[in-house]
Amino acid sequence: MSQHTSQYVFNSKEDYNVILDNMSREFEERWNHQTQSPYTNLENYITRAVLGNGSFGTVMLVREKSGKNYYAAKMMSKEDLVRLKQVAHVHNEKHVLNAARFPFLIYLVDSTKCFDYLYLILPLVNGGELFSYHRRVRKFNEKHARFYAAQVALALEYMHKMHLMYRDLKPENILLDQRGYIKITDFGFTKRVDGRTSTLCGTPEYLAPEIVQLRPYNKSVDWWAFGILVYEFVAGRSPFAIHNRDVILMYSKICICDYKMPSYFTSQLRSLVESLMQVDTSKRLGNSNDGSSDVKSHPWFQGVDWFGILNQEVTAPYQPTISGAEDLSNFENFEFKDRYKSRINRHPELFANF
Ligand SMILES: Nc1ncnc2c1ncn2[C@@H]1O[C@H](COP(=O)(O)OP(=O)(O)OP(=O)(O)O)[C@@H](O)[C@H]1O
């Protein structure tokens, strides 16, 4: 499996369209070529530390035994996945991670399983979550926000071109690498669909009105969430954040787009947020045939060196301090709890294709 996110150099708009077509062909090949993980547990790796705990598993720092490379191993209990009805999501996540290759997306390096757990081996991204960094500084200035937003817009453009709806955009799912560039992670809710779907999923603060109203929706829900994300970067809070997080009240505000624009937003940022957060999807920026180009050519992005960003030549506004692969200073301290150790293979039929 290739360990490179991109072997491409991005030079011009024409080249980029050709490159995206090539990426699309390569994506299709990998999408159609899924392999079953061997029952090798983590025997090819040495576990060094816990990087984080998600709702469905633990992410550990591991080092491969045959070399010196470090990775993040996402370990998920089969029992928990069945109990929490996440079986389809985990297959989905592996499928997408295996097929997608883009500079700002996490990808699958390897996968294994054992009687109790499934393991996804991912590139180690050790600058911590964008969420934690944002919480520390509270607000980004617009230039700083634009640096991250440009990468998210390019990643959404790629995913949509591959007919993937991401459906879980939020700062918690954006990791920072050593150079301060982003890697989007967590593809459990990502769905490959060319058109519309109607499953209710995502995180309340970022749900588009059509999802809240249980209406069929398309990839423009990601552009709505992108509007929320950019707003939150600069305002330091989500537009629909409500004291005590009354979700029903939040949903009623989302449906009528009832939020306040901070007075310090520039007119270009106001215009971007307003255009993305349109209840009427026919008016929502990003929802035309040439959707991502419309977003990228919005005046707020004027002056962005798109190819410099794609090639990661632009200096990031913040570079995490990392002294080595085992430096965990950008992560909170987590404890490891290995709850299951059975002699029987749990749910072999449900995870046969994992
Ligand atoms: N590739 C990685 N490199 C470094 N740390 C990672 C990596 N992937 C995940 N982590 C850390 O582990 C945490 C949990 O990972 P992840 O969000 O994938 O789990 P999850 O169970 O899907 O979580 P969620 O609760 O968001 O559904 C992340 O927030 C991050 O801090």
From Swiss-Prot:
Gene3D superfamilies, per database record: Phosphorylase Kinase, domain 1, Transferase(Phosphotransferase) domain 1
Keywords: ATP-binding, Kinase, Nucleotide-binding, Serine/threonine-protein kinase, Transferase
InterPro entries: AGC-kinase_C, Kinase-like_dom_sf, Prot_kinase_dom, Protein_kinase_ATP_BS, Ser/Thr_kinase_AS
EC number: 2.7.11.1
Annotated TM spans: none
Lineage: Eukaryota, Metazoa, Ecdysozoa, Arthropoda, Hexapoda
Tissues in which the UniProt entry reports expression: More abundant in adult body than adult head.
Segment forming the signal sequence: none
Protein name in the entry: cAMP-dependent protein kinase catalytic subunit 2
First-level EC class: transferase
Pfam families: Pkinase
Domain Protein kinase: 45-301
Organism: Drosophila melanogaster (Fruit fly)
Family: Belongs to the protein kinase superfamily. AGC Ser/Thr protein kinase family. cAMP subfamily.
Reaction(s) catalysed by this chain's protein: L-seryl-[protein] + ATP = O-phospho-L-seryl-[protein] + ADP + H(+); L-threonyl-[protein] + ATP = O-phospho-L-threonyl-[protein] + ADP + H(+)
Binding site for ATP: 51-59, 74
